[in-house]
Amino acid sequence: MGDNQDMGKSFLETVKFDDRGLVPAIVQDQETGKVLMMAWMNLESLQMTLDKKRACYWSRSRNKLWLKGESSGNMQVVHDILIDCDGDTLLLKVSQTGGACHVGYHSCFYRKATEALSMEICDTLMFNPEDVYGKKS
């Protein structure tokens, strides 16, 4: 039998943010079940995602909110947000426009280990990142 002790709490009260105020969010294509990416959310990005039904994350490298698709056009429409049994990981089920990965692939998990312990590409390249974000200097 499942543990229903948190069922009286609101969704936001159930989320256990870490000491930096973040919670990991796994992002999955709602139609295919394919895992697209993992990102971090803080309370503000989670509230924005819940309000707008568009994925918003917290960028640790830029130290600011990141509305997915803001610069690339590759947005994520959020259909469901699930929380794990411990309350410390979220699962977003989304409809992905274009590629989810900033290097141009449909999924950030576009490489797999071979038996020889090398890597091979196992996903579809959706766009050229230089065309979308410009060349890195």
Curated annotation (Swiss-Prot):
One of its GO terms (biological process) is L-histidine biosynthetic process. GO terms for cellular component: cytoplasm. Binds 1 Mg(2+) ion per subunit. Binds 1 zinc ion per subunit. It is found in: Cytoplasm. Mg(2+) binds at D84, D86, D88. Zn(2+) binds at C85, C101, C108. Keywords: Amino-acid biosynthesis, Cytoplasm, Histidine biosynthesis, Hydrolase, Magnesium, Metal-binding, Zinc. Pathway: Amino-acid biosynthesis; L-histidine biosynthesis; L-histidine from 5-phospho-alpha-D-ribose 1-diphosphate: step 3/9. Its EC number is 3.5.4.19. Its cofactor is Mg(2+); Zn(2+). It comes from the Bacteria. GO terms for molecular function: magnesium ion binding; phosphoribosyl-AMP cyclohydrolase activity; zinc ion binding. It catalyses: 1-(5-phospho-beta-D-ribosyl)-5'-AMP + H2O = 1-(5-phospho-beta-D-ribosyl)-5-[(5-phospho-beta-D-ribosylamino)methylideneamino]imidazole-4-carboxamide. Disulfide bonds: none annotated. Transmembrane segments: none annotated. The keyword Metal-binding applies. Homodimer. Belongs to the PRA-CH family. Catalyzes the hydrolysis of the adenine ring of phosphoribosyl-AMP. This is Phosphoribosyl-AMP cyclohydrolase. The lineage of its organism: Bacteria, Pseudomonadati, Chlorobiota, Chlorobiia, Chlorobiales.
